[in-house]
Amino acid sequence: MNLYIIFPGALYPIEGMSQVRVRCQLERLSIDHKIVFSDMHSQKTNHNITSKELSQLNIIYNPIYLSGYKSGTIFRKLYFIVKLLKYHLFTITFEECRVKTRGVRKQIFSIVEQTNPDVFMIHYWYLGYIFKYLNPRILKLIDTHHLLEEKIALIDSYDLNIIQRRRQKLKLNYSLHRQREYFKLCNLIIVNSKAQETLIHNWNKNIPVIVAFNGQNLDSFLKYGNHSDSSAICFYGSLSNQFNRKALKRLLEQIFPIIKNIIPETKLYIIGISPPMDIINKFKDDSIIVTGYVTDIKPYLSRCKVMVLPLETGVGFRGRVVEAMALGIPVVGTSNALQSIELENGKQGFIEEDNNKIAEKVCLILNNNELFTEMSINCRKFAEANFSLESTFGNLSKTIKSLVAKVSN
């Protein structure tokens, strides 16, 4: 059967977990289905990497060009100013401003007409306005990545003044209305946690939902040896994210000093794109190693014995935790950090909210090789059983097949 899948950004270079999710999903779905894929570009970009990668999966690649593509710098700046004005003057989100244009719609319709898909699937909800124009026989799917309900619940934790917070609430509530409107038009909503499934069914039990964790091809991680330093820990994630920055600051300011007081030789690896040096430099010494973005994180992660993730707020699935666990690295973090992957407390790591308790559990693993070995084995087994491509997107593929079969009959 034919699937047309759209991602409202550039798939490559892969820098975040949303891109990882899309790439891995495409890899598994392409085994069972004929796929046409589009991502979106706002300026001249080399598509050779994306085209080459997807051709290896026998995926037809049709990039979509946003307004201003191939235009000069002045035009792009003017267009950007117009988008900013729409964003600030109205409740429409910046993401919608980018994709809700006649040019984008025209390109999508052209691809739909040429490929005649059985399934039309979008990542995020922004392109849901297209659904009402599609032939009713085409199944409509949304992979949410996150829900607006999650963001609304966190609004008071944002670093905003009263006016900014009020404006943000208006935009989020507008987006929530749009999100739910598009969900009602769908044949299937794909979420990455059971918590998201519950949030959707709390307002409408009739919305068809499937939970598909962030599956990955974990073979290279599972086979990679753990060469951990007996006293090394790590913080791993995209550090351009405000919630990860807060968690890192908490670790450096309140947790790592406790750990070092108990085990002075402990090293901390900070791994991830856009490390906030304004925060790190306040605490930097020889025990803190900052890698920044690395193309292959396995050699760095595998030096560590524990991953520490003291997130207080945040949304979405913790795909970086899965990579660490596949390398046999136990995780100590808050419930906010670990609930989406359904970590079993005491088996693959520990869930604690208090700084002293987090530090205590980290030191317990560092000082107890028998416990570390047991948890390390548990982590690899847990990652393989729950987050492989087959156990996640393989199940999604079966569900899509079943839906198409029902429509055909």
Task: Show where each model-derived region lies.
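Short hydrophobic beta-strand element within catalytic cores of glycosyltransferases
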Residues: R320-A324, P330-T334
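N-terminal subdomain of nucleotide-sugar transferases
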Residues: M1-Y65
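A short, well-ordered alpha-helix in the C-terminal region of glycosyltransferases
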Residues: L364, L371-N386, T392-K398
